[in-house]
């Protein structure tokens, strides 16, 4: 490495700044132009103020899209209520008849 003049500020060291100015091109070569170009173009990182996007205005024909949902009856669960009790009784009878040892 070449010795650097200690009186120079770090941003004025030779090779610290590119010879050409930054531009708006997003090609691969321009994206790697300098650290700033790489961060903004290559990585998409910018710390500037973000522009506020305007919301789209609603079309004049639609009102507020607040149409109520029509009430629907809750589905009734249908099935044998005694079916589960019968299966429990079968399991109990099997456990009683099976010897453990």
Swiss-Prot record:
Claim: DNA-binding is one of the keywords in the record: no
Key word Phosphoprotein present: yes
Residues under site feature: Essential for Tat translocation through the endosomal membrane: 11
Region span, Transactivation: 1-48
Classification via InterPro entries: IV_Tat, Tat_dom_sf
Region (Disordered): 47-101
Positions of Zn(2+) 2 binding: 25, 27, 30
Single GO biological process annotation from the record: symbiont-mediated suppression of host type I interferon-mediated signaling pathway
Motif (Nuclear localization signal, RNA-binding (TAR), and protein transduction): 49-57
Biased composition (Basic and acidic residues): 85-101
Short motif Cell attachment site, span: 78-80
Keywords assigned by UniProt, alphabetized: Acetylation, Activator, AIDS, Apoptosis, Host cytoplasm, Host nucleus, Host-virus interaction, Inhibition of host innate immune response by virus, Inhibition of host interferon signaling pathway by virus, Interferon antiviral system evasion, Isopeptide bond, Metal-binding, Methylation, Modulation of host chromatin by virus, Modulation of host PP1 activity by virus, Phosphoprotein, RNA-binding, Secreted, Transcription, Transcription regulation, Ubl conjugation, Viral immunoevasion, Zinc
Pfam families, A to Z: Tat
Subcellular location per the Swiss-Prot or TrEMBL entry: Host nucleus, Host nucleolus; Host cytoplasm; Secreted
Region (Interaction with the host capping enzyme RNGTT): 49-86
N6-acetyllysine: modified positions: 28, 50-51
Molecular function GO terms recorded: actinin binding; cyclin binding; metal ion binding; protein domain specific binding; protein serine/threonine phosphatase inhibitor activity; RNA-binding transcription regulator activity; trans-activation response element binding
Binding of Zn(2+) 1, residues: 22, 33-34, 37
This protein's domain notes: The cell attachment site mediates the interaction with ITGAV/ITGB3 and ITGA5/ITGB1 integrins, leading to vascular cell migration and invasion. This interaction also provides endothelial cells with the adhesion signal they require to grow in response to mitogens.
Protein's name in the database: Protein Tat
Organism the protein comes from: Human immunodeficiency virus type 1 group M subtype C (isolate 92BR025)
């Amino acid at each position: 490495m070449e010795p650097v003049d200690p009186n120079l500020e770090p941003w004025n060291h030779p090779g610290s700044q590119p010879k050409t100015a930054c531009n708006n091109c997003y090609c691969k070569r321009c994206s790697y132009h300098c650290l700033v170009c790489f961060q903004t173009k290559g990585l998409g990182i910018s710390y500037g103020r973000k522009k506020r996007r305007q919301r789209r205005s609603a079309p004049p024909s639609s009102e507020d899209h607040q149409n109520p949902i029509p009430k629907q009856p809750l589905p009734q669960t249908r099935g044998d209520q005694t079916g589960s009790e019968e299966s429990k009784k079968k399991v109990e009878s099997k456990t009683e008849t099976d010897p453990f040892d």
